[in-house]
Structures are given as structure tokens and as C-alpha cells.
């Protein structure tokens, strides 16, 4: 199986900040990288698919980039509603494995 690693398990930022969350695959996944958002109430939403394509209805402050084994999700102008845990998932090979998640919190 392809292992997905999110080295930062939690991240604290201020409203209005630009935040970048990273993900690394154990082998080349040919840009088949998705990002999911899990809200504190458990709701899960697909944000980005195929590295950089925004899912329908996702605000343009979310963007994705990367290639090969290294990928990132950037949130520009962080809003309160963005407080959640973010997971990367590779879709290049079955099983479609996930990273361990990065929990984003507001800096106090």
C-alpha cells in the first residue's frame, strides 16, 4: 500500500493568515491527490481533487499544488469556518490511502 504522511498533526494560525498543509506519499502518485475537510461535528467534505482542482462550491481561498510525492493545501485569508482537520488521500492505487490528518486551530 502507498503510505501517506502528514508530518504536522496540528497547526495554530490567526484569522486572515495564509496556511499551508503538507502531505507526502511513499511513491509517485501522478497527481492523484485529494484533500478532505472534516469539521468538528464530523462532517466531511471533498475540497480538492487531482492535486489542484476545486470541488464544486469550495471557496477559491483553497488551493492545492504539488507533484510526484510531495503535495500541499493552502488556505489564503483563513476564516473561522475553516477550523477543521484536513486529510490528504491518494487515488493512484487501491487501496486509496489517507494521511493522518492536520488539525487546524485558531491561535489565541
Curated annotation (Swiss-Prot):
CDD domains: IgV_L_kappa. Residues 35-49 are annotated as: Framework-2. It holds the Pfam family V-set. Disulfide bonds join 23-88. Keywords: Adaptive immunity, Disulfide bond, Immunity, Immunoglobulin. Residues 57-88 are annotated as: Framework-3. Residues 1-23 are annotated as: Framework-1. SUPFAM superfamilies: Immunoglobulin. Residues 50-56 are annotated as: Complementarity-determining-2. It comes from the Eukaryota. GO terms for biological process: adaptive immune response; immune response. Residues 98-108 are annotated as: Framework-4. InterPro entries: Ig-like_dom, Ig-like_dom_sf, Ig-like_fold, Ig_sub, Ig_V-set, IgV_Light_Chain. Residues 24-34 are annotated as: Complementarity-determining-1. Residues 89-97 are annotated as: Complementarity-determining-3. One of its GO terms (cellular component) is immunoglobulin complex. Anti-arsonate hybridoma protein. This is Ig kappa chain V-V region HP 93G7.
Amino acid at each position: 500500500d502507498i503510505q501517506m504522511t502528514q508530518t504536522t498533526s496540528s497547526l495554530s494560525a490567526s484569522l486572515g493568515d495564509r496556511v499551508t498543509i503538507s502531505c507526502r506519499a511513499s511513491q509517485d502518485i501522478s497527481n492523484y491527490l485529494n484533500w478532505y475537510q472534516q469539521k468538528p461535528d464530523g462532517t466531511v467534505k471533498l475540497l480538492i481533487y487531482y492535486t489542484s482542482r476545486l470541488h464544486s462550491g469550495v471557496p477559491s481561498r483553497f488551493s492545492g499544488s504539488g507533484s510526484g510525492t510531495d503535495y500541499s493545501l493552502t488556505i489564503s485569508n483563513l476564516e473561522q469556518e475553516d477550523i477543521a482537520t484536513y486529510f490528504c488521500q491518494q487515488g493512484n492505487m487501491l487501496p486509496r490511502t489517507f494521511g493522518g490528518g492536520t488539525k487546524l486551530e485558531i491561535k489565541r
